């Protein structure tokens, strides 16, 4: 043992005193105590201090007794704790000499060691009470070739360049690195760079070839140099920017001091004072005032050239310009409100009555005091109806009756929640949402805000705008509405919200629950004539530069436009057409074709046809229903009621049913049910027993480009099928609607009022409908009820007995008067 230890000491001394190239010698297997290292790598030639655990301390004490040489090897970080000790350690370590062994101030054992030479571990000889391993020494073996010398020069240069960029590196350290002439020593000394990871250090230790080790070091330091060069450039830019800002700040402070001495004010100081005055005049709530004061103090400390200065300034300007406590509403006068509604809108009596009731309740509750007003909040009114029936103008009339500002906020196509609630101030270009923007534009905290086209809100990955409206329209929450940009509560409880929609089905249920629906149906012809004479014609005369004494539009001309050019539920296209006609008059007056002495120029039906061209709509009912297999049905659409033609045809051939016209699933099922019922009644209808076995049935609903669905065409399809199978014509003065069951029962459907108005517009005055829908006729205008006949039915047999003409009868030989004895007016 003494001989072995002596040989180890001699070898170590030889390595330390002669770092020149050793001669290759046969590998000698030795044994030494081993200290396992946690997350550390020791290189040859390096002196380090280590903290020891119990096992390492025992190994160090054994080594000190035997000759002060010890093995050092790092543990593998991914090795299981219960694995054999040989599997826990890297197989390449270092032989080191213990320079000092003792106790650290914290009571743990410590040791100072000097690395001597690399070692390749063998098997464990002893594991308790300390570790002892077999190993072989792996001294550096190299030949000083020109290539190696050039490699050392490049490594020296790379290390020197990195040290040059590192702050705090002394000249003494640079000189020490330059003085290292041994290639292996040079490579190993770099292993303690703080930029090396544990894995990179172990990889460097396991590289026995000196040239390869130097190449790895060179590659590493070149990467470090590139990284440090970028960091140095960025650091220099930051320092220059900071120095420039500091210099500007110093100069500005000097300029302020000089201007103050001269009695001059600076623009920044003036801006701050102006903002303070605006914020003081804005009558901010306590929470908003504290936030404004905090942001003002912050603004005073920010350089005016900084982007943050503009962001804070814009935010404070928003706070100053919002109408926090500005109210313009007048006490509600119900008589004045009725007068305004009657002036602005013709008809709509039930709608006006509901609005007046709504305003009366607000008036009574306002008289009871603010506390009661907050305790029981009224619902939000939603006007639902076809385009052009006056939904938006009703909101304007309500605002005029209340003496408030009117704001129309179109929601059609809005898909981003932030459009309503605003963008947070962390984003560049952020701003408040449209609700806060409209309040600033209105200049008052109690305007009438009309949420137009609320049924056309969209939804995508940016959020659900309908969900954002829940807080806005909820009377229990909107007194603390928080916009993302302001990040402050704003009281919306005094705002009168109204909404409009063409259809109620697409509005989310939670949003529907917060609103009360007021339905507006389409206008009948007489109402349109009155609206045109009172409102549309005078407005279009002014719009086209005509005086009332220069042009007169007759009632016949208006009816011509209604019936032949604008078959619609509302009056929007009617106004456009009147404008188009009056533009022709204005041009003729300007060109001298009309003698001013002969004014007023009378616009009659003939002039309308000449101005607007070929009529867009004609009464084609008789032409389209002059063959068996065609029946007239009624449909409801978002733009009002209308008629449809259902066609059925029976062709000799294979038994099958074909359905065309882009019909939905419900309509297809109605067609199948209608066919089944007609087949079941074949004998009573006089249809041959094998007719449906030898004929292919085709049902078609024209306007194939328009999707159609719903159950209300059931009796129409059954009537068309019965007509096609029997060869009997369907009456051309009757339209029908109703769902059919397999037993021939006629079931109730919806949209009766709109469908009846659609039939009236199309010139049809007799309608077959389910008996259980008679109650819906109470909503019809009296003028329509007086002109139309409604026939309630319970079964399809009743429908067929009324709608089908007798065999061999044509629509030309049977007059309406002769048919009237079949019909019974609705009771």
From Swiss-Prot:
Documented EC number(s): 3.4.21.53
Gene3D superfamilies named among the record's database cross-references: 1.10.8.60, 1.20.5.5270, 1.20.58.1480, 3.30.230.10, LON domain-like (2.30.130.40), P-loop containing nucleotide triphosphate hydrolases (3.40.50.300)
Reaction(s) this enzyme catalyzes, per UniProt: Hydrolysis of proteins in presence of ATP
Active site, UniProt feature: 712, 755
Disulfide bond positions: none
The keyword Protease is assigned to this record: yes
One Pfam family recorded for the sequence: Lon_lid
Lineage, opening ranks: Bacteria, Bacillati, Chloroflexota, Chloroflexia, Chloroflexales
SUPFAM superfamilies, sorted: P-loop containing nucleoside triphosphate hydrolases, PUA domain-like, Ribosomal protein S5 domain 2-like
Gene Ontology annotations of biological process type: cellular response to heat; protein quality control for misfolded or incompletely synthesized proteins
Expression induction: By heat shock.
Keywords: ATP-binding, Cytoplasm, Hydrolase, Nucleotide-binding, Protease, Serine protease, Stress response
Domain of life: Bacteria
Region described as Disordered: spans on this chain: 1-27
GO cellular component, one term: cytoplasm
KW ATP-binding (keyword) present: yes
Physiological role: ATP-dependent serine protease that mediates the selective degradation of mutant and abnormal proteins as well as certain short-lived regulatory proteins. Required for cellular homeostasis and for survival from DNA damage and developmental changes induced by stress. Degrades polypeptides processively to yield small peptide fragments that are 5 to 10 amino acids long. Binds to DNA in a double-stranded, site-specific manner.
Family in the record: Belongs to the peptidase S16 family.
Protein name: Lon protease
PROSITE patterns hit by this protein: LON_N, LON_PROTEOLYTIC, LON_SER
